[in-house]
Amino acid sequence: MPMVTRRLRDPDINPCLSESDASTRCMDENNYDRERCSSYFLKYKNCRRFWNSVMIQRRQNGVQPSMPTAAERDEILGAMQKMPY
């Protein structure tokens, strides 16, 4: 597996792995009809936007690593009581 693909499949690096998988699975199941999967695409886009804003905020505050690990992300989402995306 190429290094780029391996990094994208790593849950510590890609916070929206499940949303990405869901949108890909929807495309496969619906014969690549994009309109049927628009809700999955929107959820993935909102996920990326949310974690990008978290990453920017952490970088501004000097927190390393700028992208929280998978365990830290679970804590953040648990503290919010609901999914922000």
Swiss-Prot record:
Record-annotated disulphide pairs:
16-47, 26-37
InterPro entries associated with the record? COX23, COX6B-like, Cys_alpha_HP_mot_SF
What interactions and quaternary structure are annotated? Answer: Monomer.
Annotated family: Belongs to the CHCHD7 family.
Main location, first listed in the record:
mitochondrion
Chain span(s) of sequence motif Cx9C motif 2: 37-47
Can you name a GO cellular component term? mitochondrion
Indicate what this protein is called per its UniProt record.
Coiled-coil-helix-coiled-coil-helix domain-containing protein 7
Task: Identify the taxonomic lineage of the organism of origin.
Answer: Eukaryota, Metazoa, Chordata, Craniata, Vertebrata
Q: Where are the transmembrane segments?
A: none
Keywords of the record, alphabetical order, are: Disulfide bond, Mitochondrion
Organism, scientific name: Mus musculus
Domain (CHCH) spans: 13-55
Q: Name one Pfam family in it.
A: COX6B
Cx9C motif 1: where is this motif? 16-26
Q: Where in the cell is it found?
A: Mitochondrion intermembrane space
